[in-house]
Structures are given as C-alpha cells and as structure tokens.
C-alpha cells in the first residue's frame, strides 16, 4: 500500500491474524448439512398459519392477497421473526397484527437513522473543531494535529490509526480529496479528513486519543460530569447507525453494544444492568447525547417521542412493552427538557 500521508511512509502495515476466524460459505454436502428448499409465496402463508415454528397467525382472504404481494418485495426471512414478537404466543393473532409490528419497526428505523446521522455529523464536526483549537505544537500545524504521535495513547494505536485514515483517503472518490492530494501536496486538514471517515473510524479515533485531549474535547461538548459516559454513548449511537443502515431490526432486539449509564438515571427510570440491551435504553442513550445538540434537533426528538406514544397507544394490545424495556414512565424518561438559550 502507498500511504497518503508523507509522514507515514515508514509505517509497517498491521496484518490481522486469520487462523482463528471461522470460514463461511461452506458447501452443504461437504459438511453434511441439509439445506432448505426455496418456498413459494403461498407456502410462506402456510408456514405463518401453523404452530410448528411459533407463528400461528390467522389470515382472511384479503390478508392472503396482501401477504402475497408483500412477500414479492420484502424478504420472508426478515419478516418471519415478527409474529414471535407479539406479546402472548398462546393467543391467536392475525397477519395484520404481525405486519403492524413490522411497520412500527420500520418507523423506528427511519427515526433512529435520522437522529444517529445527526449525531455522526455533529461528532465529526466537534472533533475537528475542538481538537484543532486545543492542540499546541511547534512540530505540527493545528489543522494536522492528528498526525502527531503524541496525540495517541501509544505508538501502536498511532500507526493503526494512520493506516486506517490513509486507506479511507485512498478509497475516496471525492474531488476535494483529489484537490488536496494534487494541489496541496497531500496536506489534509482535520476538518477535511473527518468528512471521509466513517462513524466507526471517528469512534475508534476518540477511543485511542491521549486522555488529556479526549477529556478536553468531551468536557467542552458534553460537560465534565459526562466524561465517563460519552465514549460508550457514541459507540451505541454508531452501533444503532449501522443497524439502520443495514435495514436490520430494532423492535424486540437484544442489543450487543451496551452503554455506561449514570446510577441516578438507572435508579430514576428503573433500569437494571439486564435492561441495557433493550430498545428503551438505546433510545435513552440517544436522548442523552441529543440533550447537547441544537434546540431544533431536540424539538425533533421530542416530536419523535410524541409520535411513538401515539403509535403505542393505537396498538397497545400488540406491543410487547417488557420485551423492549419500556415501563410506564418511558416517555417522561425519553423526553428532552428543552432550555431556551438566553440571548441577554
């Protein structure tokens, strides 16, 4: 690989060990595995009507027609989990009930995608702005602070970060990167760099920053009292962003990236460590971050909560509240208390 940054010419590429990684795409005959046969649209309905796989949905003739059209454009495998997310599996629910849960999940995905996108853009902006102003050196310009090994927790994390950044810029098709490469001799200001980094790269960059720099950035953006929690909140936001980008499920999901929460919040909202993998806690983390965003975005978040409450109220018989970590006070916990800016 040819590295983008001139200061990085002598970096040794970090090679990931492959021996212990599982091998996917195995041929079924080679491993004695029986593969399922493809099903027809009508057979999807038959499966959903039966009890063998825990679906047990009822279908009217109209619902059969709706379902056949639906499965022409939506993967049955993706939908098949939703009947199992209805509150009581002993009860007989309709296809419409399961479809409504599916639609609620789509609503959640759209909203969460919007807000995590706002968070991603904001974090990138704040990192570029504050680090370039905090940084002081006689060796590197403020705009290229990320090139300084002293900015990182170790030489190893510095080298790995430079490799990651260099790869991102080499893959870029953006004219402004080409401009800086050809017209600026490859000198990239941090506010240009962050535009080409993924949320994951920025998240990782923050995690390997020298503690003093990271704390100064965090204190300026979120306040000193949140210093211990911010990185985990951002990691959760990044995780939720990825879920939405891949059109994966939010409703009834057990999340695998868990946040650090304030003890007083956990006590006030009745959250236990066992609840940290729920939708409610995921939304609580987004609310915690967005409480430091603009008044406009905070208002949009509260409107999201109003709409979510209306959806829950209209579908209370099919919403599985415990599965998603929601308690009676869920809305008050997730609303942002908006404090107008004093212009005096």
Residue ranges and their predicted role:
Residues 1-239, 251-344:
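Extended intrinsically disordered or low-complexity regions, especially N/C-terminal cytosolic tails and loops
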């Amino acid at each position: 690989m040819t590295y983008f940054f001139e200061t990085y010419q002598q970096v040794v590429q970090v090679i990931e060990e492959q021996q212990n990684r599982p091998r996917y795409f195995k041929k079924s005959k080679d491993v004695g595995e029986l593969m399922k046969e493809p099903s027809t649209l009508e057979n999807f309905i038959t499966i959903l009507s039966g009890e063998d796989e825990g679906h047990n949905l009822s279908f009217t003739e109209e619902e059969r027609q709706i379902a056949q059209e639906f499965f022409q454009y939506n993967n049955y495998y993706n939908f098949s989990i939703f009947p199992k997310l209805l509150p009581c599996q002993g009860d007989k629910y309709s296809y419409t009930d399961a479809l409504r849960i599916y639609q609620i999940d789509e609503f959640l995905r759209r909203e969460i995608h919007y807000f995590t996108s706002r968070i991603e853009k904001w974090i990138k902006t704040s990192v570029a702005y504050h680090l370039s102003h905090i940084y002081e050196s006689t060796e590197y310009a403020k705009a290229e602070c990320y090139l300084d090994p002293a900015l990182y927790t170790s030489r190893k994390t510095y080298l790995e970060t430079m490799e990651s950044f260099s790869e991102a810029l080499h893959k870029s098709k953006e004219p402004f990167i080409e401009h800086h490469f050809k017209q600026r001799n490859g000198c990239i200001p941090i506010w240009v760099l962050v535009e080409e980094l993924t949320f994951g790269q920025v998240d990782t960059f923050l995690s390997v920053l020298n503690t003093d720099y990271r704390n100064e950035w965090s204190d300026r953006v979120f306040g000193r009292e949140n210093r211990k929690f911010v990185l985990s909140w951002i990691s959760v936001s990044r995780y939720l962003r990825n879920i939405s980008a891949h059109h994966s499920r939010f409703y009834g999901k057990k999340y695998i990236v868990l946040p650090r929460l304030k003890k007083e919040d956990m006590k006030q909202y009745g959250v236990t460590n066992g609840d940290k993998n729920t939708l409610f806690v995921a939304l609580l983390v987004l609310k915690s971050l967005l409480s430091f965003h603009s008044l406009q975005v905070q208002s949009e978040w509260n409107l999201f909560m109003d709409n979510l409450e209306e959806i829950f109220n209209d579908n209370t018989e099919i919403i599985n509240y415990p599965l998603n970590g929601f308690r009676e006070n869920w809305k008050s916990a997730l609303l942002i208390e908006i404090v107008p800016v004093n212009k005096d």
